Every structure is written in structure tokens, then in C-alpha cells.
Amino acid sequence: MAVGKEIKTQIASIKSTQKITSAMQLVAASKMRKAQQRMAAGRPYADRIRSVISHIATANPEYRHLYLQEREAKRVGYIVVSTDRGLCGGLNVNAFREMMRSMKEWRDKGAEVDLCAVGQKAISFFRNYGGNVVAALSHLGDDPSLTKIVGSVKVMLDAYAEGKIDRLYLVHNRFVNTMTQKPTVAQLLPLPPAEDDEMIRRHWDYIYEPDAKGLLDGLLTRFIESQVYQAVVENNACEQAARMIAMKSATDNAGGIINELELAYNKARQAAITQEISEIVSGAAAV
């Protein structure tokens, strides 16, 4: 029964793959929980810095930092965060599609575009696509550190300070829940006005050391770095969630295929037995 042997070989192969996808699902679930914890731990820090920047800028209107000044956009920069590995559904493709939509809007207005690609998938995609990648960073791992990110962010901040770019956007996937990851394009520079009602209603008269200007300069740079770091951490949580869902789907699909093959094997075996019985009966009748 040659057909039956082939089917059994297929079943064994798919069961082996199913074990791998099931294990990957469990690993992704564990990594996702850790990434969610890092994501939750980083949010209060970024929110507090943003609040302090708003207070200082409001209390010192005579000093307008370069990062707060609006200017005509002739060249636009993007920091795009992706994954290093695949097997995470359409996570990267959705973010790239959203970013290319934004890029097209600026190019239609006559603006040029520079890119900082974080993650191997973004690097490969935009270099093949023809984007002007001026900075690249990959292999940050499942527990990225801020020190590894700072260098690439500085390239874009220096470009903004020198007038080489006039807008800076951050593109990444936002973690909504385990089933939903939303691609987001957020403006980093110039820093959008804060939507803090309490800050608008009240005024705090702080004393700054050494001075408000020096403090604001340092906080703005640190805020941009923290935003990119938070995006990398959040994108990692999205990656693990998407991979967990993709591997669960693959495991379930493998189970369905195995059931179909086992049914086909049983039918082939039944047909072979029926044929053997028919041959025996025919032989006995001939005798």
C-alpha cells in the first residue's frame, strides 16, 4: 500500500512541525507578558517628562527651543520600528503600509524623505524599496536597552538641529490588546502642543537649577529618546502577540490537515483491504 505509506510519512512530518509551532506559541506568550511589563514600566517616565517639558515651556515663553519651533517642511524624517524576524503575521507590512501612505502625502507636497530603520525587516524593506536610509539599527533582542538606541536617534536629532530635516515622525505598532496591534505614525518634532487641561488652567512658578534653558534642552532630547525606546518595547510586545496568534493558527491548521490525512489514510487502507478480499474471493471462485 504505497499510497498509505506516503500519507503516513506526511502525517509524521506535519506532526513534527505542529510540535514546533506549538512550542513557539508558548515561548511567544511568555515573552509577550515580559514585554508588556517593560512597556507598562516605561510609560509613566515618558509621561512625566512630557509634563515637565510642558510646564517649563509654558512658564518660559521667551525661550523657544528649536524642537518646539514650527517651520516649513522641505525634508521629512521617519524613525520606523520593525521586527528582526518574521512569523508574526502582517505586523510589519501593516506598519510599512501606513508609513508609505504618510510618505506619499509629503512627497506629493514636494518634500524629500530620510529614514532611520530599526529592525532588520525595515532595513531590508526600505533599502529594496529605494528609501534613503540614513541610519539603521537591528538585533536589539527581546530586552532592548536605551543605550543601543541612542546613537541612531542622535543621527535624526542632529539632522533636525542642522536643518537637514524639518519634521520627524515615529512609526511603530501600538499594542491595543493581544489580538489587536495598530500601526501608528506619530509626530516627534517639532513637539506637538500638550493636551493637558490642568497645565493650561494653572501656572507653576518654579526655580530652576542651573536654568530653565539648560533643563529644557536636556529634557527634550531625553524625551525623544524615551519615546523611541518606548516604541521599540511596545513593538516587541506586538511582535510576540502577533507571533503567538500566528503560531496558534498554524498549530490549529496543522491539526486540521492531520485529521484530513488520517481520514484519507483510513480510506486508502479500507480500499486496499477490500481489494485484497475481492482478489481472495475471486481466486477461490476460480478454483
Swiss-Prot record:
<dbReference type="InterPro" id="IPR023632">
    <property type="entry name" value="ATP_synth_F1_gsu_CS"/>
</dbReference>
<comment type="function">
    <text>Produces ATP from ADP in the presence of a proton gradient across the membrane. The gamma chain is believed to be important in regulating ATPase activity and the flow of protons through the CF(0) complex.</text>
</comment>
<keyword id="KW-0066">ATP synthesis</keyword>
<dbReference type="InterPro" id="IPR035968">
    <property type="entry name" value="ATP_synth_F1_ATPase_gsu"/>
</dbReference>
<dbReference type="GO" id="GO:0046933">
    <property type="term" value="F:proton-transporting ATP synthase activity, rotational mechanism"/>
</dbReference>
<dbReference type="GO" id="GO:0042777">
    <property type="term" value="P:proton motive force-driven plasma membrane ATP synthesis"/>
</dbReference>
<dbReference type="GO" id="GO:0005886">
    <property type="term" value="C:plasma membrane"/>
</dbReference>
<keyword id="KW-0406">Ion transport</keyword>
<keyword id="KW-0139">CF(1)</keyword>
<dbReference type="GO" id="GO:0045259">
    <property type="term" value="C:proton-transporting ATP synthase complex"/>
</dbReference>
<comment type="similarity">
    <text>Belongs to the ATPase gamma chain family.</text>
</comment>
<keyword id="KW-1003">Cell membrane</keyword>
<comment type="subunit">
    <text>F-type ATPases have 2 components, CF(1) - the catalytic core - and CF(0) - the membrane proton channel. CF(1) has five subunits: alpha(3), beta(3), gamma(1), delta(1), epsilon(1). CF(0) has three main subunits: a, b and c.</text>
</comment>
<keyword id="KW-0813">Transport</keyword>
<dbReference type="Pfam" id="PF00231">
    <property type="entry name" value="ATP-synt"/>
</dbReference>
<dbReference type="InterPro" id="IPR000131">
    <property type="entry name" value="ATP_synth_F1_gsu"/>
</dbReference>
<keyword id="KW-0997">Cell inner membrane</keyword>
<keyword id="KW-0472">Membrane</keyword>
<protein>
    <recommendedName>
        <fullName>ATP synthase gamma chain</fullName>
    </recommendedName>
</protein>
<dbReference type="GO" id="GO:0005524">
    <property type="term" value="F:ATP binding"/>
</dbReference>
<keyword id="KW-0375">Hydrogen ion transport</keyword>
